[in-house]
Every structure is written in C-alpha cells, then in structure tokens.
C-alpha cells in the first residue's frame, strides 16, 4: 500500500498543477503586494486541528520568509486536548478573542487553511479577517461543499467568503486508501497535510520570485545549521519581532 499512497499524492499534485496554478499565482501576487506597503508588513496563516501545521510550516523556517505571522491558539491545536480542539474548531464565537491577541492590520493578507471548509472557526476567521480589512486566501477541498453542509451559522463554506480560493484537490474524508476484506472496510492514509504544505511552499516560492523581479531582497531565513546563519537570522528577527507574536 505504501506505493499506492505515493501514487495518490502524485495524482493530486498533478491536478493542482493542472487546475490551481492561476489561483496560486494570484494569491502570491496579492500577498507580495501587501508586503510592500510597509517596512514591517507581514502576512498571517491560520488553521485548526491538523491544519494548524500549515502555520507552523511557514513559520521560522529554513528557506522560508521571515514576514510570516502564524496564528497558533492552543485551543485549536491538539497538544492540549484533541477533543477540545475539535469542539473549538466548530465554535465560531472564539475567533474574535483569538484575533485580538494578534497584530492584524488592514490591507494585509491572511491564509486560512481548512480541508473541509465547513467548520465554524475557520469560516468565522475569514469573516472576521475581512471585517478587519484583511484580504483572505483559502486553501480547502472543494469536494466537501458538493457532499455535505456548513456548520457555520451563515450556512456558508470557507470558499464562499474568501478573496482567492485554492483547491487542494484532496478528497472528502481526507483518507485516500481503502481495504475491503469480507465484512471489513477501512479508509486510511490522509492527504491534506501533504497537499496543503506543497501549496503553501508554492505560494512562498512565487512571492520570493516576485520580490526579486522588483529588485528587492526577500527576507528569507537560513538554516540554523549552516555557518553564518545566526547573524543573518537575528537581523530578520529584530526586524519582525514586534509583528510576529511567536518569535
């Protein structure tokens, strides 16, 4: 089954290449332009449950941009209680309290990652972000809207609210492999984290490319395990530490 999983990854990545490049390029351009407005401009990344790893993937990353502000509320992560995180992911009322902890500025961009796009917290995050004047990019699976209902009081899905939607080309239920034997039928091996991570790094790669074309030096962290990295990285940390809460 291990090779079948890789094959499923390839299938979805090829679908992303075939259908989502324009959306990814538009998202990168939107974010890049927002970063040029102020010397300390950042963009924000938010996700619930396992989707919070999207924010961690881009944050303080070797080869990644320093101007990334991850929104990492423990209530919506797994390490302080998986059941609690599932409860709060469906709760739209918590978002304003969470956003008040972070420096979110009008004209900046936020990437919201939700595989299902149906739960209260990520949908409310998009609504609240737009209310505060941010542009919203969503990474989600469009299959869910075709097969289930929204859990937000508005009845809307994440893709209905955002400025740019990127379909991660993942599947309803996330698991992509199946075994059926006698009366036993199991679906297993999720794809969403792999696909979301690929898309996020595609966005960052395009942002860096846009900055270089504008004769700017992208604020990219070096790996802490190569010589000279500490001095380079500390300069970037000094520049963004007032904007990036978790630095």
Swiss-Prot record:
SUPFAM superfamilies in UniProt: SIS domain
Q: List the disulfide bonds.
A: none
InterPro entries attached here?
A: RpiR-like_SIS (IPR035472), SIS_dom (IPR001347), SIS_dom_sf (IPR046348), SIS_GmhA/DiaA_subfam (IPR050099), UPF0309 (IPR022951)
GO biological process, alphabetically ordered: carbohydrate derivative metabolic process
Tell me the ranges covered by the SIS domain, including all copies. Answer: 31-213
Task: List the CDD domains hit by this protein, alphabetically.
Answer: SIS_RpiR
Superkingdom of this entry's organism? Bacteria
**Which Gene Ontology terms cover its molecular function?**
carbohydrate derivative binding
NCBIfam families in alphabetical order:
PRK02947.1 (NF002805)
Assigned protein family: Belongs to the UPF0309 family.
Please report the name of this protein according to its UniProt entry: UPF0309 protein Teth514_0240
Q: Which organism is it from?
A: Thermoanaerobacter sp. (strain X514)
């Amino acid at each position: 089954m291990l090779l079948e999983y890789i094959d499923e990854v390839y299938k979805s990545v090829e679908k992303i290449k075939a259908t989502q490049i324009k959306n990814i390029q538009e998202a990168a351009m939107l974010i890049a332009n927002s970063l040029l407005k102020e010397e300390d401009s950042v963009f924000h990344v938010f996700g619930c449950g396992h989707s919070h790893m999207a924010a961690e993937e881009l944050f303080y990353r070797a080869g990644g941009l320093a101007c990334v502000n991850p929104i990492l509320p423990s209530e919506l992560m797994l390490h302080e209680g998986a059941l609690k995180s599932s409860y709060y992911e469906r709760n739209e009322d918590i978002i304003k309290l969470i956003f008040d902890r972070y420096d979110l500025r009008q004209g900046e961009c936020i990437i919201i990652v939700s595989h299902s796009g149906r739960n209260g917290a990520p949908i409310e995050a998009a609504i609240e972000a737009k209310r505060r004047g941010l542009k919203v990019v969503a990474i989600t699976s469009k299959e869910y809207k075709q097969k289930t209902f929204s859990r937000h009081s508005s009845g809307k899905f994440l893709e209905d609210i955002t400025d740019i939607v990127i379909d991660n080309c993942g599947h309803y239920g996330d698991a992509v492999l199946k075994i059926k034997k006698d009366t036993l039928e199991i679906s297993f091996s999720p794809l969403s984290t792999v696909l979301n991570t690929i898309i996020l790094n595609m966005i960052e790669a395009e942002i860096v490319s846009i900055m270089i074309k504008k004769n700017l030096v992208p604020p990219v962290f070096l790996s802490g395990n190569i010589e000279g990295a500490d001095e380079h990285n500390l300069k970037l940390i000094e520049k963004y530490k007032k904007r990036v809460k978790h630095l």
